[in-house]
Amino acid sequence: MIKQIKYLVAGGGPCGIGAALRLQELGENDFLVLEKEDYAGGLATSFVDAQGFTWDVGGHVQFSHYKYFDKIMEKALGKTGWLTHERASFIWMKDRFIPYPLQNNIHRLPEDIFKECFEGLEKALANNSSNSLKNFKDWLLASFGEGIASHFLLPYNYKVWAYHPEKMQYGWIGERVSVVDIERIKKNIEEDKDDISWGPNNTFQFPKFGGTGAIWKSLASMIKPSKISLATEIDTIDSDNNIVTTKNGEKIEYQYLLSTMPLDILCSKISPMPEAISSKSKELLYSSTHIVGIGVEGPTPKHLAKKCWLYFPENNCPFY
């Protein structure tokens, strides 16, 4: 017997959980979330190891200027379930800690590299070559100059994306990268001060307990149990007949499929699929990573106590 569902949501990560909650909120009862793992949350999950350390495996710090999203976050953990931190992130390079963003704190670099970076900034701003940008590398060079790009932004982004910046476009940047305020930089140099307050997440909230995964675990628990099916992986999607077949052989007919799966995986499950789309889907680029957690017993060392996280752009270590 084929189960019939109006809204079938593929994936029980943040997007899938959000879709389900919104459907419930709108009074829609005819939906089902399919999640291949035996837990909800996707890559925004947190795990507790045998020693009691909590590890976030993907999504970590979040920030928002959307009232609805903020309301959902408060719904997840309540007003008292959060800690608020002032972001203090640092870069470990040239054998020293330098406050992030680098361009606002280049006076903390060795003298020769500081001069190279500052001169590169001024030259880049004077050139104003934004009309001739072809890729992410061009954008970095045009925005920050040769010095900052070569010492930090190019090697760091290659580590993060595992792909050369000259082969990436730059329309995704938005608020993710701090742009240049040359007058602010000059003031920091004159006053010899650290500048760490840039950005939309210069203060951020983090769950008191359970890591980032606590948010999505809580929100998933607000979905009616009958409306989320864990340990249920999609095997095939018959797009002509609107039928999903799961790995355990269950068939589900849907009116609307809301997919939160990676595009390449989604395309591999759809049949029939036009050959042109199928071949293009195999060319989609993506990166993967290994998450390594090291738990240290004892108090936080003084020189790390007020640092929220660190960036490692240099090639003398594999992590970033």
Name every feature range the model reports, one short phrase each.
Residues 49, 92, 229, 245-246:
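A general beta-strand register signal
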Residues 24-49:
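Glycine-rich FAD pyrophosphate-binding loop
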Residues 5-33:
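N-terminal Rossmann-like FAD-binding beta1-loop-alpha1 element of flavoenzymes
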Residues 5, 30, 59, 254-255:
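Local beta-strand N-terminus motif with an aromatic residue
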